[in-house]
């Protein structure tokens, strides 16, 4: 956990001046119907309790800066691993869904449920993130099992091609336009810097086909597993 705290702290130090000085990178493809980037991801959606607290935080920001992109409550999620990073033109018909689902199930059969504590926020040059802290090494083991199984299967994948994921953060806001009220935004960010959003009990995982923003209007569930069910061992 100390490593994660240090990493999140470094992210904050490296990027918070961008928010103070209205110099954030902006994402111009949010809500662009021509954006055809698609991929395959293993994830877990937030429960109502954590989702509600994050949404309350986002509502405070939205009142000040309504032009930014705020993740809807039902789209907040923990990314376990990107199997195929979003590629322009990638289609579900490019893969054998049954093969991917089978590898997914084999990868997680020895993993039980785990918890992620969401406490505090940090920032990147273009986003506001909720800090996540797993309660044990299960998430790390899970990611390594997925990496090993998909690499052995030699199916199309781009695992770790952008970066090797090691955190449990959740993206909550994407900057899509210059800020109009930097000082007010900074006050809210400072208030929530160490805020306790609650604990996510990760009892199920999904393998999904998705776009860059994980919009549910585009997301298709390919396989879902209950981590606490004996049925997954059969």
Predicted features along the sequence, with ranges:
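Histidine-dependent nucleotide/RNA phosphoesterase domain, centered on the 2H-phosphoesterase fold
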Residues: 1-234
